Amino acid sequence: MNIYDILKKPLVTEKTTLEKDAKNVISFEVDRSANKIEIKNAVEKLFKVEVSEVNTVNVAGKLKRVGRHYGKRSNWKKAYVTLKEGNNVDFFEI
């Protein structure tokens, strides 16, 4: 699997910004079939940083309603990537 297929997009929210500042953790939406080793290798190769830990969460899609019709958003996977001391990724800086 290509590294650009594994990492879909960074998650930039208030919570993830605080985690980045306090714990040096960055968050990504990743491919549902990707494992922790593939995620670690993709982040290290793409951003040229050293990763110490990867935690993943499978997020269930929500039920949404439009009028009287129901639909379901897709399930997705979130990855919390902890970087080693001295490493950082600057694309979160606004």
UniProtKB/Swiss-Prot annotation:
Keywords: Ribonucleoprotein, Ribosomal protein, RNA-binding, rRNA-binding. It comes from the Bacteria. The keyword Oxidoreductase does not apply. The keyword Isomerase does not apply. GO terms for biological process: translation. One of its GO terms (molecular function) is structural constituent of ribosome. One of its GO terms (cellular component) is ribonucleoprotein complex. Part of the 50S ribosomal subunit. Contacts protein L29, and trigger factor when it is bound to the ribosome. Belongs to the universal ribosomal protein uL23 family. HAMAP family: Ribosomal_uL23_B. One of the early assembly proteins it binds 23S rRNA. One of the proteins that surrounds the polypeptide exit tunnel on the outside of the ribosome. Forms the main docking site for trigger factor binding to the ribosome. This is Large ribosomal subunit protein uL23.
